[in-house]
Amino acid sequence: MTQEQDGAIGDALTLLEAVVRARLAAGDAGASYVASLAAKGRGKIAQKLGEEATETVIAALTEDDAALTGEAADLVFHLTVLLAERGIGWDAVAAELARRHGISGHAEKAARAP
């Protein structure tokens, strides 16, 4: 990935997070899908995220690249809604990924508290 692509991904997530947070704050369920989803509660947001994860897996196994890309975008969108509803930003996720960088997946998993 080029530095430009890396920046574009970060910019896209930053913009998405800002829009989601603004719509959550506005709380206009009649005008905003984000607000209407949030009005149904965290459980509904989590359920929708699970549905999108399943659709992403199915697309990966049975559909074309465009379908997988679309489902991945839906998954990231709904994850952003859930994170924002919990008050967690993509900066926290990026910090956790940076912390794990260079650590073996097996070692990282073994170091987690039970």
Regions found by a protein language model. Give the residues of each.
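Flexible "arm" and connector segments at domain edges
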Residues: M1-E71, V76-P114
